[in-house]
Amino acid sequence: MSGELNGNDTSAQAAVSAGSVLEGAAFADEGEQHNESMKTLVLGALGVVYGDIGTSPIYAFREALHAAATNGILARSDILGVVSLIFWALTLVVTVKYVLFVLRADNNGEGGILSLMALVRGALKGRPDLILGVGICGAALFFGDAVITPAISVLSAMEGLEIVAPNLTPFVVPAAVVILVTLFSVQKLGTGRVAIVFGPIMALWFVALGASGLWHIFDDPTVMAALNPYYAVRFLTVSPAVAFVTVGAVFLAMTGAEALYADLGHFGRKPIVRAWLWIVFPCLLLNYFGQAAFILSHGEAAALPFFQMIPSFALWPMVLLATAATVIASQAVITGAYSVARQAVQLNILPRLEIQHTSEKLHGQIYIPRVNLLLGLAVVILVLGFEKSSNLAAAYGIAVTGNMLVTTVLLYIAMTRIWNWRVSRALPIILGFLVIDMLFFSANIIKVHEGGWASIGIATVLVLIMWTWVRGTRHLFQKTRKAEVPLDLIVEQMAKRPPTIVPGTAVFLTGDPKSAPTALMHSLKHYKVLHENNVILTVVTASKPWVASADRARVSQYNERFMLVTLTFGYMQQPNIPRALGLCRRLGWKFDIMTTSFFLSRRSLKASVHSGMPLWQDKLFILLARTASDATEYFQIPTGRVVEIGTQVNI
C-alpha cells in the first residue's frame, strides 16, 4: 500500500511539473501585458470560458458508460478504459492541441473560427473561396453548438431532481423550459451586472467537482491506474465496435474546448491557460476519476453517477449549483453567438443585423435581437423534442467535432503560411490532430439517426443562408457595376455642363469608389443639382479585429467639388460613420454633421433567371436582403441627415 501511495505522490509531482513545463511552453513567446490583475482575469475566464466544458461531468461519463456497457453489464476494464480515454482525450485535445498550438493562432489578439478564417485568407493570395467555405462551415457548426449547449446543459442539471425527489421527474422538462425562456428574455438587459458573479460561482463549482471526486477516489484508489494509456488502448482494441461507439460519447467531455480559442480576445492567452492548467483540468480529472471509483465500488450507480455520488445532505445544494453553472455555461455560449454573428456581418457572410450595445463602458457587450429570438426558439424546440439530455448527446458531438476539424485544417495553413513552418515540421503535428479529430467525428457522425440529424440540419440551413448571401452580394455587385458609370466620366460631363450648385456637403456611400454612386446619378438626373462639397465614401472591413483610430480614415481630394474618403473598421468593431468622419478633421476636412446630408441607395431586388444562381437561391437572397437591418441604423447615421433614393435591380 505504501508503494502505491508513494507512486501516486510521484505522479502528482510529475503532473505539477508537467503543468509547469506546459505553461512555460505556452508562454514561450508571450509578450502581452494585461492592465487587470492576473487573478481577476483567471476568475473571469472560469466564468466565461470554462462553463461549457466544466458542466460536462454531469452527463459525459454517464453517456460513455452507457455506450460501453455490453447488455447493460460493465466490466472493471470497461470503466477503467472509459476514464482513461477521457483523461487522454482531455490531455491531447485540450492541453496539447488548444493550449500549445491553437491559442497561438490569434488574429491581433482575437480568436474564434471566423478570426482564424480571416487570418488565413489574408495570408493567401487571391483569398480563395475554399477557405471562405471552410470558415462558413465552421461558423455554422458553432451556431449549432450554441443551440445545443443550453438545451443539454440545463436539462442535465434539472435531471438531478430525479435523484433528489423522484416524484419531481415530470417537472424536469417544464422547469428547463422556464429557466431557458427566462434566460433568453433577460438578454436585452445586458449581462454586465450579473457577469460579476459568474467567476466566483464557477470557481465554487470547480471546487465542488474536485472535492466530490477526490472524496470518492478513496472508494477505490486503484482507479488511478487508468492514467496509464494501456487501459485506453486495451479498451479500443479488445472490442473495436463497442469502443468506436463509446469514443463518440467520450467526446462529450471535450465539448466547450473550442471556447478557449473563441474567448481569446476577452482574457488573453495567459489567464486562459493558467485557469485550465491549475484549476479546470485538475478538478475535471478528479471528478471523472471519482465517478469511476464510485461506480467500481457501487456497481448499480451507473444511471446518474454524478448526482448519485453526492451525499444526501448536499444533493439540493449541488442541484442548485449545477443549475447555476449550466445557466452560466449557456450565457457564455449565447454571448459567443452574438460575437460570431457580428463578425459574420462585418465579414459580409450574413446580412446586416440590428446590434444593441448593453453597456456604455464595455463595447463588447452586445445584444442582437434576431439572433436571440431564433436561438431561443431553437433551444426550446430541442428541449421539448428530445426531453432528455441523453437524447441530445448525439446531436451535441457532431457540431463540436466538426468545428474542431475545421480548426485543425485552418491551423495547418496558419502554421505553414503565417508562422512559416516547414511542411515537414507542421504536417506530423497536424496529422496527429486530424487522426484524433476524424476518430471523434466519425464516431459521432454514425449517430445521425439518434439525434445527430438536428446538428447537421441546423448547420446545413446556416451554411445555405451564409453561402447564398455571399454569392448574392457578389452577383449584385457585378450586376450594378456593369450599369454604373465611371466617376471620371461624370466629372468630365459636369465640367462641360455644370449643374446647379447648392450649399452644404453630400456624402454618397458606395462599394466602388471608381464608379459614380447610384444615389449621385439619380440626384443629377432628377434634381439637376450638385452640392458644394461631395464625398464619395467607401466603408471597408479589415481582415483583423481592430483598427486604430489613427488608421480609420483615408482622405484624398479628387477635385474642387469631390473628395474620396475610405473608412476602415475591424471585423469586431461596430461602424459609426459620423464619429469616424469626425476623425477627418486632422486630415484637413472639417466635417460638420449639421451641414451634411447622407445619400443612400435603397435597392428593390427582383429575381431573374439569368442571375447565375438558381431561382430559389435568388428568392432566398432577396428575402435575406429584405430582412437586413437598415443601413442608417447599422452605420449609426442620424436619420434626419439621410436621403434615400430607391432603385430596382434584377439579379
UniProtKB/Swiss-Prot annotation:
A GO CC term assigned to this protein in UniProt: plasma membrane
A single GO molecular function term of this UniProt record: symporter activity
InterPro entries: K+_transporter, K_trans_C, K_trans_N, Kup
Pfam families associated with the record: K_trans (PF02705), K_trans_C (PF22776)
Transmembrane segments: 41-61, 82-102, 130-150, 163-183, 194-214, 235-255, 276-296, 309-329, 366-386, 395-415, 426-446, 450-470
Keywords per UniProt: Cell inner membrane, Cell membrane, Ion transport, Membrane, Potassium, Potassium transport, Symport, Transmembrane, Transmembrane helix, Transport
Top-rank lineage group of the source organism: Bacteria
Subcellular location: Cell inner membrane
Membrane topology term: Multi-pass membrane protein
Catalytically driven reaction(s): K(+)(in) + H(+)(in) = K(+)(out) + H(+)(out)
Chain's role: Transport of potassium into the cell. Likely operates as a K(+):H(+) symporter.
Homology family: Belongs to the HAK/KUP transporter (TC 2.A.72) family.
Identification of the protein by name: Probable potassium transport system protein Kup
Gene: kup
